């Protein structure tokens, strides 16, 4: 028996205190695949972060010898390493691709993706087919990251390396803003598509519309298939995909042409041999590969024998120099269709002059043909793109400026307002895509704040109206790209003042009263501040009426944006098609309402307890869209009680679905309909995790705790976009 036990132990060591973490174990998700995913609300908590709790990246960045770092990066560009030699002796094109692909995952639909958290280090991005061999670029950067340590994040280093690469080859940039803070594990909240295979594309409707909120047209690609849609070499069809993808990144036609032409002025594509020679991506590579993937058995497996995209060749005869040769080649030749040594569709110039041949990546004395991708020829054969491209070709300075500006936008679009930018190269110019807000120059004393709150509460506006307006203004914030929020009071402006969810007629009435109050005040106070202060005053009143005398923290200093500072088309994507906090849903969707609530909470940067307490509080405060009764489980509307949770959990009631999708809350004995609810309301009693929070807040001894937690979560949302407060606090510490 003892020998048998020893044998069993040697076969399976997972017993006792050792837990089997292998992928073949059964998880809750396996048992219940439709289980609500709340983990996205806690994906970046302190437990995953190795820094001390008081670590402040912005403060560390201020200690950085920025110019020394740029010089080290400049030297790196031409310090070719035998383990991964630089094409043409210059790593610049590789680092441009790395930076571009870090930033290029951004999409305006939900603000997710982009360069601001350094997630190219993690799955799935580190193993996307389109990011093949960028693991080598990151390894080349490691000695510099090691040297400068906490003073420069990976996220900032990726983009700065791209900037230095452009500058080192004669290209123009207009600046750099630091401030991107690394995360320490993948961002699980981002939906990259439903496909189960790399390079598959099942994301278009029958009429060809790309699924919201995706921007890339193919799973595992940053943008579009360079060989053409579905691998078909049709430049005009490729132009349609390009236009839609870049539009969903927030780029117009001119910016699109500038980026493609400017980026392809440098470097080459790699397809020296069949893809069968290429090993697994980093996440699938053997442990001894130490995180490096795509190791190739073709020839030397590097240099001129490299296989990456499968397309082979440089675009220009001068692949490490900023010039006009991309357009010279694009418009100077006819192009014939062929396949690369790897079998990918590409185009070759007809009868090229010897001066227009490119150098070999390893041997500059050897000349090789250039090529164009199907997506490059889209710039020649799409009428609108062609107009822009020919204009750039005739105006080199305009092209250089357009590329520099588009590159800055590409690499900074997901950073939010300019107040977050760090470093000596931040451009002085304000850009419309940064959602600029005028600075304010007033301060308010506590006495003045109390006086304004009294005016607001005596204005005839109800607690419900004040809370609704403040929530509508602040809850546009997206933690993903730091856009939206109460600062700027853009709820006064198009398009927000026309959104259905904001009840335009009621909103106009509330704003009119705020404007009257503003005119009556002895000093200029922004409407943005008044909206938030009004909501805070209403919450205080509601808490007092519940028996709790509390203060809602308020920090003045918000500005009022103008319509001229507001890009209507850009802000249109912030319109919520569902807001479970207001029990609003524009129409029926394939995604359940409770999942849309969790997604909204994640974009607001909320935890599951914060989401729970806010929903419960907003219901009893009467914040529902158009005063819908669903989920308002109280007879004391406008009073900040825990009634939502108490009545949700009361076993005197049963919950009965109706044909309209609404649920009736009926007395079990009499059958009387007491309340109505949506799935968003019922999920707090149905989901075991959310029910545990609901039970916590329903306890008799947690009524005050509920009020205080609601206020903390409320203030978090109201101040979500107040990066100026963070900046001022940092400056006061360093002063």
Swiss-Prot record:
GO terms for molecular function: catalase activity; heme binding; metal ion binding. Formation of the three residue Trp-Tyr-Met cross-link is important for the catalase, but not the peroxidase activity of the enzyme. There is a cross-link at residues 100-223 (Tryptophyl-tyrosyl-methioninium (Trp-Tyr) (with M-249)). There is a cross-link at residues 223-249 (Tryptophyl-tyrosyl-methioninium (Tyr-Met) (with W-100)). InterPro entries: Catalase_peroxidase (IPR000763), Haem_peroxidase (IPR002016), Haem_peroxidase_sf (IPR010255), Peroxidases_AS (IPR019794), Peroxidases_heam-ligand_BS (IPR019793). The active site is at residue 101. The record marks 97 as: Transition state stabilizer. Belongs to the peroxidase family. Peroxidase/catalase subfamily. Homodimer or homotetramer. This is Catalase-peroxidase.
């Amino acid at each position: 028996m003892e020998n048998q036990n020893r044998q069993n132990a040697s076969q399976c060591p997972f017993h006792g205190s050792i837990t089997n973490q292998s992928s073949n174990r059964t998880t809750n998700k396996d048992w219940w695949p439709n289980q609500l995913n709340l983990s996205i609300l806690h994906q970046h908590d302190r437990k995953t972060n190795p820094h001390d709790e008081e670590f402040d990246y912005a403060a560390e960045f201020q200690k950085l010898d920025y110019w020394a770092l740029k010089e080290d990066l400049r030297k790196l560009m031409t310090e070719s390493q035998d383990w991964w030699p630089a094409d043409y002796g210059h790593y610049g094109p590789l680092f441009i691709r790395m930076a571009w692909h870090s930033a290029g995952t951004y999409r305006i639909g939900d603000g997710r993706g982009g360069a601001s958290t350094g997630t190219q280090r993690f799955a799935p991005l580190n193993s996307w087919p389109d990011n093949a061999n960028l693991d080598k670029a990151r390894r080349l950067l490691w000695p510099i990251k090691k040297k400068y340590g906490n003073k420069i994040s990976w996220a900032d280093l990726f983009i700065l390396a791209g900037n230095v690469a452009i500058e080192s080859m004669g290209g123009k940039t207009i600046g750099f803003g630091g401030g991107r803070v690394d995360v320490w594990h993948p961002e699980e909240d981002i939906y990259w598509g439903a496909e189960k295979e790399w390079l598959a594309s099942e994301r278009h409707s029958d009429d060809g519309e790309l699924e919201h909120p995706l921007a890339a047209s193919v799973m595992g690609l940053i943008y579009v298939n360079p060989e053409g849609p579905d691998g078909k070499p049709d430049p005009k069809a490729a132009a349609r995909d390009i236009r839609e993808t870049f539009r969903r990144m927030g780029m117009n036609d001119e910016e699109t042409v500038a980026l493609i032409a400017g980026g392809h002025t440098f470097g080459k594509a790699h397809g020296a041999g069949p893809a069968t020679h290429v090993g697994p991506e980093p996440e699938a590579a053997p442990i001894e590969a130490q995180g490096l993937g795509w190791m190739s058995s073709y020839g030397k497996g590097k240099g001129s024998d490299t296989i990456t995209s499968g397309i082979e060749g440089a675009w220009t005869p001068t692949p490490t120099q900023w010039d006009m040769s991309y357009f010279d080649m694009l418009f100077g030749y006819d192009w014939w269709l062929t396949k690369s040594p790897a079998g990918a569709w590409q185009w070759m110039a007809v009868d090229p002059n010897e001066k227009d041949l490119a150098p070999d990546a390893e041997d500059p004395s050897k000349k090789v043909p250039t090529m164009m991708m199907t997506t490059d020829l889209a710039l020649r054969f799409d009428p609108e793109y062609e107009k822009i491209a020919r204009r750039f070709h005739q105006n080199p300075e305009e092209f250089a400026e357009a590329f520099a500006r588009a590159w800055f936008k590409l690499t900074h679009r997901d950073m939010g307002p300019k107040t977050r930018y760090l470093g000596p190269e931040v451009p002085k110019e304000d850009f419309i895509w940064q959602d600029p807000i005028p600075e304010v120059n007033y301060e308010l004393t506590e006495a003045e704040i109390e006086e304004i709150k009294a005016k607001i509460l005596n204005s005839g506006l109800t607690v419900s109206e004040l809370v609704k307006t403040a929530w509508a203004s602040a809850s546009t914030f997206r933690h993903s790209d730091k856009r939206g929020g109460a600062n700027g009071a853009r709820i006064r402006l198009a398009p927000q003042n026309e959104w259905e969810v904001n009840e335009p007629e009621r909103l106009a009435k509330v704003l009119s009263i705020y404007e009257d109050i503003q005119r009556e005040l002895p000093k200029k106070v922004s409407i943005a501040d008044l909206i938030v202060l009004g909501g805070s005053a209403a919450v205080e009143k509601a808490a007092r009426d519940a028996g709790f005398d509390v203060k809602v923290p308020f920090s003045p200093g918000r500005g009022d944006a103008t319509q001229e500072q507001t890009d209507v088309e850009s802000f249109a994507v912030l319109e919520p098609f569902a807001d479970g906090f207001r029990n609003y849903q524009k129409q029926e969707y394939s995604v359940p309402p409770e999942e849309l609530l969790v997604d909204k909470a994640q974009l607001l940067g909320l935890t599951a307890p914060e989401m729970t307490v806010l929903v419960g509080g907003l219901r009893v405060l009467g914040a529902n869209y158009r005063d819908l009764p669903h989920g308002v489980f109280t007879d004391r509307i406008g009073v900040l009680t825990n009634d939502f949770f108490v009545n949700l959990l009361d076993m005197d009631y049963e919950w009965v679905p109706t044909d309209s999708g609404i649920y009736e809350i009926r007395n079990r004995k009499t059958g009387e309909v007491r309340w109505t609810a949506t799935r968003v309301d019922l999920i707090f009693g149905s989901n075991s995790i959310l029910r545990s929070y609901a039970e916590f807040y329903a306890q008799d001894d947690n009524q005050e705790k509920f009020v205080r937690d609601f206020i903390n979560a409320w203030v978090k949302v109201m101040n979500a976009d107040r990066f100026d407060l963070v900046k001022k606090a940092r400056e006061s510490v360093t002063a």
